[in-house]
Amino acid sequence: MFLIYIVNNFLYYVFKTIIINLGAIMKKILYIEASPRKDRSHSINVTKKYIEKINKNNDFDVKKIDLWNYDLPEFDGDMLNAKYAVIAGSEASAEENNAWAKVIEIFNEFQDADHYIFSVPMWNFSIPYKLKHYIDIVTQPGLSWSYSPEDGYSGLMTGKEATIIYASGDGYGEGTGFESYDLQKPYI
C-alpha cells in the first residue's frame, strides 16, 4: 500500500508536468504494450493512468499495439536477405521482397505516430522478448536509420519522442547495489 501511495503521488506530479508539454506537439500516439499479464501488470496499469491523464483535456489519437496479440514476422532467411539487399543496394528476390513488405507495413505504422508510449516490464533483468522482436522489426536500414562511410550512422526519424514506463519487481536504481543487474533501462 505504501509503495502504491508514493507511486500515485509521484505519477501525479509527472503527469501534470508532461501534460503541459504534450498538447502542442502531438496528436497521434502509438502505445506499445509489452506485458502479457494485462490487468495484473504494473507497467500496463500505470500506462493506462498516464494515457487517461494526458488525454483528459486533449484529443489524442491513441493506437495500442499489444505485442502478445500482434503478428510479428520471423527474421528468417528471406527477411535477412532482404535486409542485406537494402544495405548493399542490390536487388532482392520476389520472396525476399514479400518478406520485406511486412517490415515496411509495421514500420509505417510505427513511423506514423507523433509520440510513442512504451509500457515495459522487467523480465529476467531485461525486456520481454516480444518487445525486442518488435524493436528489431522497426529498426531497419533505409527506414529508421542510414549509414554512410562519411557520416556513419544517422537516425531518419527526427522530431519524435517517447515516454517509457518501466516496472520491475525490485529496485535497481543508483545506490541500490543492484545497478549492474538492470538491463531493462539501458537497453531501451
Give short role names for the model-derived ranges:
Residues 8-12, 21-129, 133, 140:
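N-terminal beta1-alpha1-beta2 submodule of the flavodoxin-like/Rossmannoid cofactor-binding fold
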